[in-house]
């Protein structure tokens, strides 16, 4: 328990620098663009580091098919792939900014589930 209080004290003493670093991380995350794909690139989805879908590409050949379920599945798979990549890229930015600090451990100190 005393170690946790000491760690918290150190964290609080560096709040100004931490705020600046977090603002920088926010900017980098906002600039992240990742592409998820499915069907060997027949469907691609672009997402931001903030988890917003900003572009969807569907190859024209898929519109000629009568298999709507296949198209739906490809769009869903590409979207999930893009969001997974965005989450991984965001986690990487946080890890890089914190010098490898595990945010899930900090979260546990406060009884939360942020990481």
UniProtKB/Swiss-Prot annotation:
Keywords: Cytoplasm, DNA-binding. It is found in: Cytoplasm, Nucleoid. One of its GO terms (molecular function) is DNA binding. The keyword Ligase does not apply. Its main location: cytoplasm. It comes from the Bacteria. It holds the Pfam family YbaB_DNA_bd. GO terms for cellular component: bacterial nucleoid; cytosol. InterPro entries: YbaB-like_sf (IPR036894), YbaB/EbfC (IPR004401). Binds to DNA and alters its conformation. May be involved in regulation of gene expression, nucleoid organization and DNA protection. Homodimer. PANTHER family: NUCLEOID-ASSOCIATED PROTEIN YBAB (PTHR33449:SF1). Belongs to the YbaB/EbfC family. This is Nucleoid-associated protein LBJ_3002. It comes from Leptospira borgpetersenii serovar Hardjo-bovis (strain JB197).
């Amino acid at each position: 328990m005393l170690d946790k209080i000491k760690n918290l004290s150190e964290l609080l003493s560096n709040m100004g620098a931490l705020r600046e670093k977090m603002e920088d991380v926010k900017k980098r995350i906002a600039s992240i663009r990742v592409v998820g794909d499915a069907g060997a690139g027949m469907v691609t989805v672009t997402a931001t580091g903030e988890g917003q879908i900003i572009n969807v590409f569907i190859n024209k050949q898929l519109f000629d098919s009568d298999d709507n379920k296949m198209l739906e599945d490809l769009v869903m798979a590409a979207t999930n792939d893009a969001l997974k990549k965005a989450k991984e890229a965001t986690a990487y930015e946080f890890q890089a900014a914190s010098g490898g600090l595990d945010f899930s451990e900090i979260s546990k100190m406060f009884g939360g589930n942020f990481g």
